[in-house]
Amino acid sequence: MTTSTGKINLLGLTQPEMEQFFDSIGEKRFRAGQVMKWIHHFGVSDFAAMTNVGKVLREKLEAVAEIRPPEVVSEDISADGTRKWVIRVASGSCVETVYIPTDDRGTLCVSSQAGCALDCSFCSTGKQGFNSNLTAAEVIGQVWLANKSFGTVPAKVDRAITNVVMMGMGEPLLNFDNVIAAMKIMMDDLGYGISKRRVTLSTSGVVPMIDELAKHIDVSLALSLHAPNDELRNKLVPINKKYPLKVLLESCMGYMSTLGGKRVLTVEYTLLKDVNDQPEHAAQMIELLRDVPCKINLIPFNPFPHSGYERPSNNAIRRFQDLLHHGGFNVTTRTTRGDDIDAACGQLVGQVNDRTRRSERYIAVRQLSADVELPDSAASH
């Protein structure tokens, strides 16, 4: 992608795109691997630091290209070790990236959009509307910046980040091409070399793009379910009015079937007091998912101002988990992490600039979510 300087930002190029770039400037394709290693393995953003690249080529690159990550506005560290970065992107808006450490892994939660058009009623990101899609460089740049922050370069030595989840701000499948490109870089050995089983894309249910996904990439899939029936899900997750549960689950099953192997769908379910946390909801969920190979991740609601929802009691949370477990499901309840720095699930809000233009974009992308058409670049692969 060309930046405001008129130069190509190499940070967001996949390996084939990087090879094409070097072709276009009359250089050998093997240079793509050299430069990608400098960018992603060593966190270099200055061509002058690339010691195995000749001076003439470095000067040539300086003239036509750059390595420009998004800007870190702030970094907060929670008492539990969770980190949150506020990152400014080219649109002027800010997005948030969260790192969650546990005993055996370090998970980076990456944003795909500034704001979100899907307007899920319990999510603070949706309350701010939609501003812009992130570029591939801005998506993968969150991984690049986190590695730099931890000092884990080379990136594949004693890495802090073992897993990446596309569960930050935005609906990843409404930024299809850029998210796919970024995930390919995450998994490429010339990028971050993260296993495909450790890269997860979470969607609220953009069915045409789920159907398209397996043609482009093989990653783990998570579904933001949040309700066990269409009537309730229509209220909580409005895209359900376009793609109801039967169609949505068939699409998810189709994705897993196409890729083969022992695939398991991660089902995310935010528990809202007296809304979707009752025994009848658990019973409906057991019936809904009976034939779906899945694991269920319960997420107690993380309150934010004016949400209109409350977190269930610990007893209600345990009761719901026990009912699902007795129904034969592998169920975990997500421990709230980073809520003292507003980094918990559902709390990411960033900062969206230019509210009038944002509203226009919001309306446009809401229409897109209701009437999805594949982008030309997706259809041509």
Curated annotation (Swiss-Prot):
This is Dual-specificity RNA methyltransferase RlmN. Keywords: 4Fe-4S, Cytoplasm, Disulfide bond, Iron, Iron-sulfur, Metal-binding, Methyltransferase, rRNA processing, S-adenosyl-L-methionine, Transferase, tRNA processing. PROSITE patterns: RADICAL_SAM (PS51918). The active site is at E96 (proton acceptor), C345 (s-methylcysteine intermediate). Its EC number is 2.1.1.192. One of its GO terms (molecular function) is tRNA binding. It comes from Pseudomonas putida (strain ATCC 47054 / DSM 6125 / CFBP 8728 / NCIMB 11950 / KT2440). It comes from the Bacteria. The gene is rlmN.
